[in-house]
Amino acid sequence: MSESNKAIRQPIISVLGHVDHGKTTLLDKIRGTAVAAKEAGGITQHIGASEIPLEVVKEICGPLLEQLDVEITIPGLLFIDTPGHEAFTNLRRRGGALADIAILVIDIMEGVMPQTEEALRILRRYRTPFVVAANKVDRVPGWKSHEDTPFLESFQKQSPEVQQRLEEKVYELIGQLHQHGFQAERFDRVRDFTRTVAIVPTSGVTGEGIPELLMVVTGLAQRFLEEQLKIEVEGPGKAAILEVKEEPGLGHTVDAILYDGIIRTGDTIVIGHPEEPIVTRVRSLLKPKPLDEMRDPSDRFRKVDEVTAAAGVKISAPELEEAVAGAPLRVVGEDEDVEEVVREVQEEVEEVTIETDQEGIIIKADTLGTLEAVVGEFKEKDVPIRKADVGDITKKDVIEAHAVAEKDPLLGVIVGFNVGVTEEARELADEYDVDIIIDDVIYELVEKYEEMVEKRIERERRKRLDELVRPGKIKVLPGYIFRQSKPAIVGVQVLAGVIKPGYPLMREDGRELGEIKQIQMHGEPIKEAKKGQEVAISIEGPIVGRHFEEGDILYTDVPSEHAKLMFEEFKDLLTEDELEALKEIAEIKRKEDPFYGM
């Protein structure tokens, strides 16, 4: 393929950040600023994306671009319209994210928050270069806004106190990013953009800092991504599905971001799917009508014959109802074999969905993109994964998780991102005691899983503790001898710890007495009695008056190995009075056996 057939496409830019940090406002402001520069050509609206042509970038940045000291050959910037993690993860290509650059929006007053941390993890995993927009500078106490001006210009006009305040906030942010493994600095102090994350203070409300933000993004793309942005102009199109939608009069359509090559009406396309790829033919390609032509809301699209990367396009074709977001889409070229393209696409999907761990958790997500992100997050925590798939949680998933739980209860779990659970699955999960964890925030899914593991470990420990003879101390109540022998039945008060049927008893001098057969309260049998309770117990073996008397103190006869386990492994699960009773029992026992409980 000759270089003459290649062209440089626009870098694809995704905006990420914590909820309420101003992603949408900033993105709207960038678009609004571009629309306002209509002398230079304004903005080109795509499906799911907005293109800011280079001329418009130049108009907004003014002389700032000259500071880059590099010839700008990219034709513009393509911003993904939907901010957030989900759009970012759905726009995926083999080996990484589709976005060439991300803008991570952080509220300068709040700093790094949980979803910021998640965004940083995703960006690191996908190795996506990013710029930090330290947003909401207009909220810095005392800041005087200057609409749509470059940040540095506005900064110079602030009082020394306000400048100091902003510097402190930027340095706090630098420190937080450093804790997450990223070296960062204010953009005008960055010497090496390959090693240092640039922080651009911005305001999505006033537009301050947007010229520098666009300058830094343009410079990054031009200087470091030029090779990556070279595309084969006439090559078969490659795209990622952003969304699957049903449109009136069109049926099921897919909104896709084309990142390489060309797609034409009539082309055969292959779309990846967890079951098997969808092979279909493009019925029509649609782009949004310009705002000034959109008179009828139901007639929002115009048909085009072909679309070249990078672009957002709506594709209408048969058999798209099964398509899923995050799936790869490939055009079958004239000299390509359909089967070969199907195989390549399937391999790409299987990289995400097929797991090799025999025992592991089951992950379900709403799209291939989010599935890949969730799988990545759990792999980072070294959690084995048995199956990862797209779609709601079904009975089949529960049966599979139950089979895993039989061998390892901590892995017999289903994790769902943004999915539903069928009624059948819910009922079966209750019956089989299979945990289902659902959330629409990835980091919370991982946290919930870790909490569940802790609870299960705790439950397992309590279960093991309950299999031991636990420490108990009782007093035989005077006047409550109901039967003297075969079995002896007496009233007792539990002074410390716990007693249960089956527990052996001993006297204060360590002599064995016999086993508790039954415990009754108000004439009804009970499973255990704890400190403070007064109950009747039957004891097989001893005779009241010969082996023990009313008023005597008795203890549970805890075997040495049980005491050892309680001292070493389960001490934290014992109540204070149980621990006290255990110490007293050990003291009695060690008169005969100095190594008791050791």
Swiss-Prot record:
<dbReference type="GO" id="GO:0003924">
    <property type="term" value="F:GTPase activity"/>
</dbReference>
<dbReference type="Pfam" id="PF11987">
    <property type="entry name" value="IF-2"/>
</dbReference>
<dbReference type="InterPro" id="IPR036925">
    <property type="entry name" value="TIF_IF2_dom3_sf"/>
</dbReference>
<dbReference type="InterPro" id="IPR004161">
    <property type="entry name" value="EFTu-like_2"/>
</dbReference>
<comment type="function">
    <text>Function in general translation initiation by promoting the binding of the formylmethionine-tRNA to ribosomes. Seems to function along with eIF-2.</text>
</comment>
<dbReference type="Pfam" id="PF00009">
    <property type="entry name" value="GTP_EFTU"/>
</dbReference>
<dbReference type="InterPro" id="IPR000795">
    <property type="entry name" value="T_Tr_GTP-bd_dom"/>
</dbReference>
<feature type="region of interest" description="G3">
    <location>
        <begin position="81"/>
        <end position="84"/>
    </location>
</feature>
<keyword id="KW-0648">Protein biosynthesis</keyword>
<dbReference type="InterPro" id="IPR029459">
    <property type="entry name" value="EFTU-type"/>
</dbReference>
<dbReference type="InterPro" id="IPR023115">
    <property type="entry name" value="TIF_IF2_dom3"/>
</dbReference>
<feature type="region of interest" description="G4">
    <location>
        <begin position="135"/>
        <end position="138"/>
    </location>
</feature>
<protein>
    <recommendedName>
        <fullName>Probable translation initiation factor IF-2</fullName>
    </recommendedName>
</protein>
<feature type="binding site">
    <location>
        <begin position="17"/>
        <end position="24"/>
    </location>
    <ligand>
        <name>GTP</name>
    </ligand>
</feature>
<dbReference type="GO" id="GO:0005525">
    <property type="term" value="F:GTP binding"/>
</dbReference>
<feature type="domain" description="tr-type G">
    <location>
        <begin position="8"/>
        <end position="226"/>
    </location>
</feature>
<dbReference type="InterPro" id="IPR005225">
    <property type="entry name" value="Small_GTP-bd"/>
</dbReference>
<keyword id="KW-0547">Nucleotide-binding</keyword>
<keyword id="KW-0396">Initiation factor</keyword>
<feature type="region of interest" description="G1">
    <location>
        <begin position="17"/>
        <end position="24"/>
    </location>
</feature>
<dbReference type="Pfam" id="PF03144">
    <property type="entry name" value="GTP_EFTU_D2"/>
</dbReference>
<keyword id="KW-0342">GTP-binding</keyword>
<feature type="region of interest" description="G5">
    <location>
        <begin position="203"/>
        <end position="205"/>
    </location>
</feature>
<feature type="binding site">
    <location>
        <begin position="81"/>
        <end position="85"/>
    </location>
    <ligand>
        <name>GTP</name>
    </ligand>
</feature>
<dbReference type="Pfam" id="PF14578">
    <property type="entry name" value="GTP_EFTU_D4"/>
</dbReference>
<dbReference type="InterPro" id="IPR027417">
    <property type="entry name" value="P-loop_NTPase"/>
</dbReference>
<comment type="similarity">
    <text>Belongs to the TRAFAC class translation factor GTPase superfamily. Classic translation factor GTPase family. IF-2 subfamily.</text>
</comment>
<feature type="region of interest" description="G2">
    <location>
        <begin position="42"/>
        <end position="46"/>
    </location>
</feature>
<dbReference type="InterPro" id="IPR015760">
    <property type="entry name" value="TIF_IF2"/>
</dbReference>
<feature type="binding site">
    <location>
        <begin position="135"/>
        <end position="138"/>
    </location>
    <ligand>
        <name>GTP</name>
    </ligand>
</feature>
<dbReference type="GO" id="GO:0003743">
    <property type="term" value="F:translation initiation factor activity"/>
</dbReference>
<dbReference type="GO" id="GO:0005737">
    <property type="term" value="C:cytoplasm"/>
</dbReference>
<dbReference type="InterPro" id="IPR004544">
    <property type="entry name" value="TF_aIF-2_arc"/>
</dbReference>
<dbReference type="InterPro" id="IPR009000">
    <property type="entry name" value="Transl_B-barrel_sf"/>
</dbReference>
